[in-house]
Swiss-Prot record:
<feature type="topological domain" description="Cytoplasmic">
    <location>
        <begin position="1"/>
        <end position="21"/>
    </location>
</feature>
<dbReference type="GO" id="GO:0000160">
    <property type="term" value="P:phosphorelay signal transduction system"/>
</dbReference>
<protein>
    <recommendedName>
        <fullName>Sensor histidine kinase DpiB</fullName>
        <ecNumber>2.7.13.3</ecNumber>
    </recommendedName>
</protein>
<dbReference type="GO" id="GO:0005886">
    <property type="term" value="C:plasma membrane"/>
</dbReference>
<keyword id="KW-0808">Transferase</keyword>
<dbReference type="GO" id="GO:0006355">
    <property type="term" value="P:regulation of DNA-templated transcription"/>
</dbReference>
<keyword id="KW-0472">Membrane</keyword>
<keyword id="KW-0418">Kinase</keyword>
<dbReference type="InterPro" id="IPR005467">
    <property type="entry name" value="His_kinase_dom"/>
</dbReference>
<dbReference type="InterPro" id="IPR013767">
    <property type="entry name" value="PAS_fold"/>
</dbReference>
<feature type="domain" description="Histidine kinase">
    <location>
        <begin position="344"/>
        <end position="541"/>
    </location>
</feature>
<keyword id="KW-0902">Two-component regulatory system</keyword>
<keyword id="KW-1133">Transmembrane helix</keyword>
<dbReference type="GO" id="GO:0005829">
    <property type="term" value="C:cytosol"/>
</dbReference>
<keyword id="KW-1003">Cell membrane</keyword>
<keyword id="KW-0812">Transmembrane</keyword>
<dbReference type="InterPro" id="IPR004358">
    <property type="entry name" value="Sig_transdc_His_kin-like_C"/>
</dbReference>
Amino acid sequence: MLQLNENKQFAFFQRLAFPLRIFLLILVFSIFVIAALAQYFTASFEDYLTLHVRDMAMNQAKIIASNDSVISAVKTRDYKRLATIANKLQRDTDFDYVVIGDRHSIRLYHPNPEKIGYPMQFTKQGALEKGESYFITGKGSMGMAMRAKTPIFDDDGKVIGVVSIGYLVSKIDSWRAEFLLPMAGVFVVLLGILMLLSWFLAAHIRRQMMGMEPKQIARVVRQQEALFSSVYEGLIAVDPHGYITAINRNARKMLGLSSPGRQWLGKPIVEVVRPADFFTEQIDEKRQDVVANFNGLSVIANREAIRSGDDLLGAIISFRSKDEISTLNAQLTQIKQYVESLRTLRHEHLNWMSTLNGLLQMKEYDRVLAMVQGESQAQQQLIDSLREAFADRQVAGLLFGKVQRARELGLKMIIVPGSQLSQLPPGLDSTEFAAIVGNLLDNAFEASLRSDEGNKIVELFLSDEGDDVVIEVADQGCGVPESLRDKIFEQGVSTRADEPGEHGIGLYLIASYVTRCGGVITLEDNDPCGTLFSIYIPKVKPNDSSINPIDR
């Protein structure tokens, strides 16, 4: 039954909030420490006070015993003279009473005259005859007192009497109280301060633990470990100084780190990932879909700062292999291009069929025949010219779809004569190169549609005849405002920021690809209006990574 009650009490204590448990533990410990200190100081003061009273009483007794007037009065048994001397001494000193006796311990003087002539109490057998001084505590005729007794010697050294100096215990208790009461007050104040500090400490711990219990924190840690292990992306967390605080299995696998995760914790990220700029520079800034290179692996990386209020605790970086994303992107791009081409062709085919139906109804059979032959010939010529000029079939397919799209939008896309592409520049695959060209053309289409000026013509020049692969896209659209030219290639920046939807990604993606290949982008005003984007990508990737990829 006792064990059951103890378990219930312990369970009740465990159910209390963790900061409250900390507060109670510190409070109990503080009370124990203060009680121990109080006991120590009280015992030390008791010893000091007892020793002090004894020394003082004995010194006073010996001074009185050596007084010539006292010696003379004891010899002659002069009660009146002894009373006069004793009364004067008691007025001038702080002892409570003095008793003077003869060599047989018979009282010659006592504060109570009725006690004179009677034997003194609490005498030590044989001490007076031997001339010994001693202390004794007990309840006598004056009450409970501490006494110092010393013999009175005559000129010949013989014991002729005894002096007893007494300090009442009640007086000693008052002295003790005068010291211990303020000391008790100090301890109470100290206990109050410790309670207050304990409460502040408990509140601080609660804030640091974000209001959670240790079990909740342990559960969150386990959940984080499970989340880190289950996420397909690579995850690395670093502190503000660039030291690894967490790394998951997929990150180690992609980066070629064979050791277990715990061995990498606390190591500088610069020793684990090269280059490590994405992990160490401006980690307080959020970054999304950044093309980077970690240990020779091309990745798409994201970064999110970890904060506690205004304090920066570090950052967490997630990344996936760019090859995997490129594969998915290529598949998606092909599907989108296929769907867009089908939609465009369907729209044109419906218009063409409506025209054809009208001509048939009007029995214009010759014109119907000419129309069918002309349409087929135009489409085939475009396809043949694209196949001949552009060796990469994905790029050729993209351009065919963009020509059809421009026609559907009421625009005209011209591929400048002399355009050709025999091979892709190093560092870019078909999907990435198509993304550069496609995004430039999409921006040109949108700019042309948003402007009431211009001839609605978009021109493309693409060539790899020289040392560089040159891409030029010109439109006569709304142009790029001067206020945006210095940051138009930053993520999220767009001339259509006021319109709903996600903007500011296409040019950022273009700049990322061109930067990686050591290329250069220029942005100029077109004549008479619009914009001319020019991109120069070297056929041989330069070793100098300090080249500025964007020239505005």
